[in-house]
């Protein structure tokens, strides 16, 4: 099972931050609480994304390109019969729009929902931990419980939680630095073309579970279920 983050992993910019920064900047007090660890992404979204206009948000998202290697990864995974899903602490509003534009609208997406201005929903939230809107850890954990081996792709701080339940991790940026600090092995990548090379060359070992290095990251202390 391939499980990938969206913002700054599939997309070339953080679309959620672009939309909020342009249409409804995060309030300084909420940002300060977030920086101190007293608030989570859900608090940021409620203070900002909840107040954006749907059409304006989609118009901004439509200007964002995706990593061209992602299309190749999807095509390869489908030929090999490997399921692939997107997990994001952002919103289906822009994720599904961008994927649909790229002919990838059939991919499953685990993310938050913008219903209308002033109303957000958290279909993949974790009742035991309200910090994130979409609990990436719970999504990865559920896929593992169904019998899948999970290969995770990510870049950001929320990916720390999802990666902690993966068998293998492809990481860059903040996630890569966190894994290095915690001495957990990972595959570095700058784009999906890099990752696809590794997957193609080692598919049999990924399939039978013998591919090394496997992730040794333990569940994050913040993760509760």
Segments from the language model and where they lie:
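Alpha-helical substrate-recognition element adjacent to the catalytic core
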Residues: 1-113
